Amino acid sequence: MAKDENPSYLHLIFLSSRIRVFILDPPLSLPLSHGQCELQVVEEAAMDPSGLNLQGNPAENQESWTSGVSVGRGTPNLGVGTAVAGRSCPSSTLFPGSSLSSTALLNTMHEGSFPQTALVAGSVSSADEQHGAPPVRPSYNLPAGCTQVPISILVFHRRLTGRGSRCRSPQSRSFMPAPALSGVSEADGAYGPIPQSDFLSLRGPSEVFPGDMAMNHSEPATSYGYNSEYAPMHLQPNGLYTEASNTESEREASQLQQSAEAVICDSLSKLESAMEKIQGQNPQESSGLVAEGSADDNIHKYHQKAKRARTQITHSDKIDLPTQAVSACKEKTITQIEMQIADAERTEALKGEDAPAQKLKTRRRKHRPKVIREDRPAKKQMATTSEEKPLNQKPKRKYVRKNRNPSSLEKCAEPFSDHSISRESRTTVRSSIASVRRRLQFEFGEHGVQRDQSSMTNSWYQNQEKPVNAESSLCSVTKSSVQVEHGQELHMENSPEGLFFGINSKLNKILDEYIHLPEAAPKPSEQIPLAASGHVSEELARKQYDVRHTHDPDSTSYNIERSGLITTKGHKKDLDLNYSNTNGFQMYCSASLLPEMDSTKGSMTKVSKMDKNKKRHYGGESSLAGTQSSIIMRTAAEMLAVYQACGIKKKRSARVRRNSFLSVMDLEKNTSQESTRLPRSCMEALYESSYIKFMTKKRSQKARLNSPNSIQPNIDQKNRFSSETVFSGGFNGLKRSEETFQKTLPQIPDDKRINLDIHCKVPVESSPNTSTPPYMDYLQGVTSKFRYFDLNTEQVHKTEMHLSQTMPSLSSLGATNYLPNALVPYVGGAVVPYQTQFHLVKKQRPRAKVDLDFETTRVWNLLMGKAADPVDGTDVDKERWWKQEREVFQGRANSFIARMRLVQGDRRFSPWKGSVVDSVVGVFLTQNVADHLSSSAYMALAASFPTGSHGNCNDGIAGQDNEEIISTSAVGDRGTFEFFYNGSRPDIGLNFEFSMACEKIHMEPKDNTTVNELTKGENYSLHCKESAGSLCDHETEIDHKAKSISDFSAVELTACMKNLHATQFQKEISLSQSVVTSESILQPGLPLSSGMDHARRNFVGSISDTASQQVGSNFDDGKSLTGNDVTANETEYHGIKAAATNNYVVDEPGIPSGSSLYPFFSAIDCHQLDGRNDTHVSSTSPNCSICSASSNFKIGTIEENSSLFMPFDAHLAQRNGNMIVDTNLSSALESTELPVKLLHCGKRSCYEASEFQDHESLYATGGVIPETATKADDSTLKSGFASFNGLPDTAAQASKPKKSRTTSKKNSENFDWDKLRRQACGNYQMKERIFDRRDSVDWEAVRCADVQRISHAIRERGMNNVLAERIQKFLNRLVTDHGSIDLEWLRDVPPDSAKDYLLSIRGLGLKSVECVRLLTLHHLAFPVDTNVGRICVRLGWVPIQPLPESLQLHLLELYPVLETIQKYLWPRLCKLDQQTLYELHYQMITFGKVFCTKSKPNCNACPMRSECRHFASAFASARLALPSPQDKRLVNLSNQFAFHNGTMPTPNSTPLPQLEGSIHARDVHANNTNPIIEEPASPREEECRELLENDIEDFDEDTDEIPIIKLNMEAFSQNLENCIKESNKDFQSDDITKALVAISNEAASIPVPKLKNVHRLRTEHYVYELPDSHPLMQQLALDQREPDDPSPYLLAIWTPDELKDTREAPKPCCNPQTEGGLCSNEMCHNCVSERENQYRYVRGTVLVPCRTAMRGSFPLNGTYFQVNEVFADHSSSHNPINIPREQLWNLHRRMVYFGTSVPTIFKGLTTEEIQHCFWRGFVCVRGFNMETRAPRPLCPHFHLAASKLRRSSKKAATEQTH
């Protein structure tokens, strides 16, 4: 018998004589292990080929058959043919229940006489009793060699009994029975309708659809089931069934056995004689040819099968059968009969021309294709034995078409019926017609996957392409069914011959991407292992099914695998794909190719025949060779897979993702060159063609047709098929689009034109288990846009296709809610049936989400400038609600700051030095890393590129770094001469003299309304004189005229203005790539004159630190210097821009430089830059560092500004020390000339006016500026510039309407960002870069340095290569866009504009930008980093959506996205002032490092635990035993809790301290039976001595200054109650009330594990505090401490037993008592300790405060550091200095905590210890080299990290603990 998972029928055919077989009626009951066997014998006499005409109408066959009459329910009707009408007895039927004779017949079968494997040619025809239709004679062809032999058909019909399936013998090679029919029950016994084909159809019961019978309505569905419950029936001669008596059955039992033996023996003898005759005619084909049974094999490919040994079929049940029938047929074997039948089939196929009814092509070339590989000899196919064959193979189907005209392209044959082919028996019933096509199968069972994987892989590589005839028909109607496991079926109907598509793999790739490939040559064959090709895994094995269809001798087989390969030929031949499903939809795809090359023939170039020497290589993907034109629909990733499979290494940098796009490409026509390109990378191979253009796509963007020669219909890979996209239902109505697109653009050549036509058909039937939206309607609308595809020109419109846009995305659904039979996308774009749920990630941790309401989102959009409505709107209720919300958050912020001040100290705003560029680079370094690493990286970068790193001019030789470029440009009528210097940055205190001598320049107006032009000034010469006396001459040629000027005595500048209109002049001073612009406004009536007899104007200026500085001043009638409030009107002008002085009166002889006032002229600090103007002339004076004009300045020392936020507008007279600058609004002044001398005087400088000469006067005419002495302008306030430092007013900023222009629009590449700089420079008084805003790094050197050098400097931070490249690109952008590395103008632009500009910088996100704005630009902003976001969630400031029931808040690992937290917080914090926002942010950062860490937070010491929801959740879980999540990582702890490790602790694992006031206290007992023994601790001498020292040294310390923090128990109880209610919905209010008790501060804690090896976390050292006046400060030459630095210098003393260069405990090496003194060995512990105790000096290390070490300049206002952080001097750490003991007697002693980072130092400390550390102690995490100012690791003497412990030290520590 046979074994299968779902066997139902077993068919055998016997060739017999014409003798009638009388089978008696007594039923046979054959006991089997898993079911019963029903035997049916049908005699078929005088059978000739005409009676079995396949191509004839089945209705014609019915005429020659006698209708059977149905008697009884479920009884099969066996029709009797007319050929046997004259006989006396029709065929008899053996029903179940027969005893002896049936047993004898079966015994004969079991002895091996029956050819059970391949003798299948037909089936029993029966009629359904319910329909009452006459039985239909099965339509099949018999082998040609057996036409003269009468055939009787013996059918074994097995009926399942529900007890499983029978076991097949290992030696059996029987065919695979068809699956059991669905819906069959034992009660009624009526089997469902069978498929239309025959008994051996490959279809299972799930494939029976009404559409199958609709193909041929003349063939009614027949059923051949029988129920054994009914009495056995006997077919009488008149065709009626009657009941047979039991006695009659017993009498005829013996006759049955004899008749069966006679039938078998006679049939075999007749068959042998017929086969011998056939063998004589065709000796070369005597051996059987068996078709491959693999799902990927072509049924036309055969292999010689060696004759097998005799196989005996035995049953699992050892049934003793008679052996009489065995001896009669022992000589015959199953193999011989199988081979004979196969030869008979082939003989019949060769004699096809003899059949008069089949007028088809008579010629058929017998070709046995082979794949010859060059790398190895051809593999000989071995005979496949039954042991190698999997168990659940299904037979193939035979497709035979009617006779047709091969040359006709319009005439198509009628649909033919499917005929079965036994795959297991390796036989094929073939006819002389063109093609036989097998079916695709989905076999996803265990055996289906294991089924002949090697055969699948081998056949994949061994397929050889056959030539294609261009004239072959493309319209023969075929049909292919795709079987899905659970009954789903996909049909591909009305598909042309030359186009087959694997629905299993690429149904969704029809419209994916179109790549035009002409003539691609085959790659050399290469054996690929299974692991490399990807055919081993189950998933990949599912996708390797393909369809191969064979045409006429000149035809080829097309392989449509996962890549969706479609090859078309012919002239304007539409190729239609019809994917249909009875319960699904039908989709037609028509692709037409117009003539490509051979236009004279009216068709495309024919596909040449494959050369025998050119072999096809399949590397896991389908490939096409030998075609001039083809359409290959595949993705770029799939093309790369071809190259990868060929053994080509793929570069990591050349990775192409699945979402990338591959343009339409033309490969070279010469196919012989393809083989020479194998050792290339995949990207090199793709880039090889000049027509290939790769376009990368961001995830958030869509495809753009932005390149010629490209067609990119994009299908979103993620949304192509959702989880609910089922191809078998959910659609109603029948629609089909007949629209075709035959128009093409005029510019499209004929050889590059594609017309795509897509028709969609939706059947009426709908599936009840799906509810998918109308899919095809949307597809029709999208495909209608697929009109014109131009392969050579760029399309104006974009074509985007999303097959399932209306359906939920696969990723969005989280791989849930999959239907059982859903087709889902898989790797490579294949579509596979869904069996189990997809797991996109192994374990996806839940992430909390912020519960954002609509109002919050609306206000956020308003604040971000995404809407034009006012912030609060017009609704009074909303405004009142927002006011309450902001009051609540203001109270929370104030409470948090006040609480943190008690613990972490005062962290109010204290400005640090530094520029905006420093902060921008600082936020680059602080991203996604700890602050101590990012700060060290910036310190290392500053040490590698210190300021003033450029060399000076040596011996008159100018290098690249000190080259001065003076550029001249002319734009239209406007000429601009720009001069600059490039030299070293002189230190403060150096004096320079700089003079500019020009020809006499006259400024005369051309008319009364236009601007003035400088009519002369062709030549000028610049001279710079250093105080040392060196002179560098600079001569510049203008207008190509060189003239040396020796008269440097005077400069005349005359301006005559007679109009009342504002005139603007600008003088641009540029150096190399830098342009420094100063725009000045000349008001009418302002003559500026200077006599020739005046002395030369010299000045000495102070130096700014950036590469460019705005130089200039504003001129207004009667307007004084008003800083930021001055507004200027930009007017178009022609001529040279010149700088002029402002009209102001200086009451006191000086202008404070530390104030917000812009100086008259700024000192220019320049570096070598590239000139952006047309002409530039180089000069060689690096020392020229001061630019001069016709004025003299003096710099004097001033007192520092006492008030930080001194508003400029509120007080026009600003006091800075003893210097006051007032404004004079006089309108009577007529002329002005102000010589000012600029001098350097120490670190602080100011501008001081020199004496006025007699002929110099100051005039001002007309006052144009309103009085601003008392208040600022409202518009200025609303613009956010009410204060001098650009800090916006809070109320005005909040109420200001936001711009409607979005950020994305401003961030476009076309936006001119330099316009913001020009506006800031033109609208406001020009501002000098003050000393506090200088750069801390030589950014010009960083920009010009090698990226590797930058990367090496920041290597310890991580991501150094990426960040180094970003930093350098950022600096290059500044030079390119703005001409200099300067962003100080961002302080003067509106906050929104500054924000948009910063967001446009690559690498800066919202958090980084907000950090720069708040901490550096001092704008109103609140950045939300990881610390802030985590704290806000835990404190309950930000509401989150409900978490899963199994997840408590304290177990949450993934917090919400930071942007969503900021979206909720900022609308509620936007009303706070800048100082509050700064301190709130700084305190939260420190709080997140010290207390509220990400993992293992120090909740018991947290001062905010009463309001914390995280602590309430953890407390409730530990104390009240809330339900814990079902986690596999749960461990049973004996004496500690592990809730902080992400697991819920065991409630009763540790005895808890008693809660005060608990009503259940008497019921709580600790499970500790050990006796309690209390004994006092022995006092130690060390502690007593230490206490004494503390009393002596710290006598003046007041410990009461440290405040005591008390826990708010009421708030804690309320918070705990809310947490319990949220976590446990089942708790009643009474239970919660009982659970909540009065908890004290001591009891309000959660159990935490005891920290081990605390010394590895931190090391505590006592140090001495050095005052500023200590003599040691001068002896060590330490830098002056910064005034704002709260920390002093410290001195750490080494104890006598601490040796400087050892980490191990010291050991004595001598005995002082015996030797009588101290030895001189420095390593002797005893002697050294004694000597140091007696010595008057001690060894020590200096600790430098962080702010002083950085000289007060650091990015982001120094928030990287703690306020009490110090650095250990690297030099004195390794070589301690000697300090006299008497200098330390009166010093205060403090505690310093050394460690690797702040979080590790404070881990496990109590609140009081943390308080003491911040109030009285210090922290130190790094060393510091005071010479190079670079960070260094801590000396092991102070702290040795656990990661740096030696193995020996660890062992020693372990021994000491034991």
From Swiss-Prot:
GO cellular component, one term: nucleus
Cellular localisation: Nucleus
Cofactor(s) needed: [4Fe-4S] cluster
GO molecular function: 4 iron, 4 sulfur cluster binding; cytosine C-5 DNA demethylase activity; DNA binding; DNA N-glycosylase activity; lyase activity; metal ion binding
This protein's UniProt keywords: DNA-binding, Hydrolase, Iron, Iron-sulfur, Lyase, Metal-binding, Nucleus
Basic residues: compositionally biased ranges: 360-370, 394-404
GO term, biological process aspect, one: chromosomal 5-methylcytosine DNA demethylation, direct 5-methylcytosine excision pathway
Free-text tissue specificity from the UniProt record: Expressed in pistils and immature seeds. Expressed a low levels in roots, leaves and anthers.
Pfam families: RRM_DME (PF15628)
Residue ranges of the region described as Disordered: 347-416, 1288-1309
Binding site for [4Fe-4S] cluster: C1492, C1499, C1502, C1508
Co-factor binding details: Binds 1 [4Fe-4S] cluster. The cluster does not appear to play a role in catalysis, but is probably involved in the proper positioning of the enzyme along the DNA strand.
Main function: Bifunctional DNA glycosylase/lyase, which excises 5-methylcytosine (5-meC) and 5-hydroxymethylcytosine (5-hmeC), leaving an apyrimidinic (AP) site that is subsequently incised by the lyase activity. Is responsible for the demethylation of methylated cytosine residues of Tos17 retrotransposon DNA. Demethylation of Tos17 cytosine residues promotes its transposition. May be involved in seed development.
Annotated family: Belongs to the DNA glycosylase family. DEMETER subfamily.
Protein name: Protein ROS1C
UniProt organism field: Oryza sativa subsp. japonica
Gene coding for it: ROS1C
